[in-house]
Curated annotation (Swiss-Prot):
It comes from the Bacteria. UreD, UreF and UreG form a complex that acts as a GTP-hydrolysis-dependent molecular chaperone, activating the urease apoprotein by helping to assemble the nickel containing metallocenter of UreC. The UreE protein probably delivers the nickel. This is Urease accessory protein UreD 2. Keywords: Chaperone, Cytoplasm, Nickel insertion.
Length: 297
């Protein structure tokens, strides 16, 4: 039967086969949170209140406690459960003069296996005069073949305070996963009074687990942390920081240094559990207050 005869085989009516539907490209997520907070009233220890909050995509920001405390605590929630290749997540925070805010995450952030595209996380911070922000997310877990590009940018007033803690886990420990092929690119740029005071870049590309196994790079570490304090007077607390690090759990290697008006702590461990415990213990003493409740769950 010819194509024309076949097409007219149903009572003389043309029956045209539908063209195959195009296969949809992988769905990407664009998550956005924009937050602005300010101090309520004129008292120096007045509570911090939300001035403006915008949310988009799978990112949400929740405030479990809004009492009379000066520091407002917020919890970032990724309703998508993780970050996939091609996703772009952006968090922007403005802390106005005299206000104080703590931001954490509801759980560890998972960076899924990529089909080639990068996942991108952009964090932009601004802290006004005498303001304070504690940026304390829970750990980021990179799956094998994950590709993550992360940027952290902050602009601080001359007397503002910023405390940052970032923990990365290279592979899912429960599965004994190795990063045979992955990308982790982490870039920090922090300015005070318009002047660059801290710049740090990390790039792990390729066989990351093999790279971290080398003595000169990670010594077999599968979890790493950077804690950075840019509060006025932080540089003068170097001896205190080193004393705290001497009491960390076995298996955690750590060091502290201070220069240019800030203090930095690095930690390495073969697993996330001891490193997470070490970071939480250090931060609780350093901040002189308990860690957020989500860290204790």
């Amino acid at each position: 039967m010819s194509e024309e005869a076949w097409a007219r085989s149903a009572g003389g009516r043309a029956i045209l086969a539908e063209s195959p539907r195009p296969v949809p490209s992988r769905q990407r997520s664009n998550g956005v949170v924009r937050l602005r907070v300010a101090r309520a009233g004129i008292a120096a220890d007045g509570p911090t209140r939300i001035v403006d909050l915008a949310e988009g995509g799978p990112l949400r920001l929740r405030f479990p406690r809004q009492g009379a405390e000066r520091m407002l605590e917020g919890v970032l929630v990724n309703t998508g459960g993780g970050v996939a290749c091609g996703d772009v997540f952006e968090v922007s925070v403005m802390v106005e003069a005299g206000a104080a805010c703590l931001l954490t995450t509801t759980a560890a952030e998972k960076i899924y296996r990529s089909d080639g595209a990068n996942a991108t996380i952009l964090n932009r911070i601004e802290v006004g005069p005498a303001g304070r922000l504690d940026w304390l997310p829970q750990e980021t877990i990179l799956f094998d073949r994950a590709r993550l590009v992360r940027r952290f940018e902050a602009d601080l007033a001359p007397d503002a305070s910023l405390l940052v803690a970032e923990i990365a886990v290279l592979g899912r420990a429960a599965r004994g996963e190795r990063l045979e092929q992955a990308l982790f690119e982490d870039r920090w740029r922090i300015r005070r009074g318009g002047r660059l005071v801290y710049a740090d870049s990390l790039r792990l590309d390729g066989a990351v687990s093999d790279l971290m196994a080398r003595a000169a790079t990670g010594g077999g570490a599968r979890a790493l942390a950077t804690l950075l304090d840019l509060a006025p007077g932080a540089e003068a607390r170097l001896d205190e920081a080193r004393t705290l690090l001497d009491a960390l759990p076995a298996g955690v290697e750590a060091g502290a240094s201070a220069w240019n008006g800030h203090l930095a702590v690095r930690m390495l461990a073969p697993a996330i559990a001891p490193l997470r415990e070490a970071a939480a213990r250090f931060l609780a003493v350093w901040r002189d207050r308990p860690m957020p409740r989500v860290w204790q769950s």
